[in-house]
Amino acid sequence: METWKTNLEETKKRYIDWWNHKGIILNMWEHFQKGVKPHADIPAPAPAKDLNQKWFDPQWRAEYLDWYVAHSSLKADILPVANTQLGPGSLAAILGGVFEGGEDTIWIHPDPDFNDEIVFNPEHPNWILHKELLKACKAKANGHYYVGMPDLMEGLDVLAALKGTDKVLLDTVMQPEVLEQQMQQINDIYFKVFDELYDIIREGDEMAFCYFSSWAPGKMSKLQSDISTMISEDDYRRFVQPFIRE
């Protein structure tokens, strides 16, 4: 891998120190282009025809991200990584949630036909889109930058996106045993999905995560639970903590 970042090896060492609770990383959420000398002569693609192409056309996004990284600052510990996100919590879309492209983000709406069954369909178009996007970006990157892992999210947040937050909150009282079972099902699917996407984006064993622009010498994940602000400590320990720990 020959990236456009000239000090990548130094940055890797600082990340390894950081994973071992030493030192700091000087990074940023995304990238900036102002005053940057391009790393390569990569032309920008034609403007997206609409929001669907902007977010859901793998080839267009791969071309855009190739241009974007080539024209972005990679100083300090800023990583050369393509942001392949398909919305926050896109595991919910893989499981049946509905995509909606916005101007600045992707919204994921609940599955209108959700019936409390958590089923992974390997032929679901949203799952196929995830893989096609990563493969297109990996081919375009040609070793010049990492292809980031999308923001799949985990657990209760995924179910809230898939079913609706209000309904999930009611489930903590009305059907807690069913909710626990669903959390385990989501975890099991998460690991399957993550591993398959990791095998697409990995560089050796290394990977990068597009949100928070993080790097690791092996598998890593970002863990969170936004819905935890709306539940009790006891419910957090029952419905969130065990599955994040897993």
Region annotations inferred by a language model:
Residues 81-116:
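A contiguous, low-structure linker/loop signature
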